[in-house]
């Protein structure tokens, strides 16, 4: 499990980036959020990392 904060979030498009505690940025799509959570820039999250078309991506994103 990885931890970080929402660095950028585009509510209209449903995507953004998580700044991981490891210093890397991870692309995140609304489809990779745990069901029912609402996010905004600056909140802390936990997530798994997968290798997608855009490089490393966050999945199973949930609030902490």
What is each of the regions a protein language model found here?
Residues 34-46:
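Short nucleic-acid-contacting surface segments enriched for D/E, G, S/T with interspersed K/R
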Residues 1-10:
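Structural detector for short beta-strands of small beta-barrel domains
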Residues 24-37:
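Beta-strand/loop nucleic-acid-binding surfaces
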Residues 13-18:
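Short aromatic-glycine-enriched beta-strand elements
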Residues 50-64:
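OB-fold/S1-family single-stranded nucleic acid-binding modules
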Residues 4, 42, 58:
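Residue-level signature of catalytic and energy-coupling elements of molecular machines
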Residues 3, 25-27, 44:
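Well-ordered beta-strand positions in beta-sheet-rich domains
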């Amino acid at each position: 499990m990885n931890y970080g904060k929402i660095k950028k979030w585009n509510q209209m498009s449903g995507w953004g980036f998580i700044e991981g505690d490891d210093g890397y940025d991870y692309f995140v799509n609304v489809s990779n959020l745990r069901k029912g959570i609402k996010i905004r820039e600056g909140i802390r999250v936990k997530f798994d990392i997968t290798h997608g078309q855009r490089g490393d991506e966050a999945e199973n994103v949930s609030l902490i």
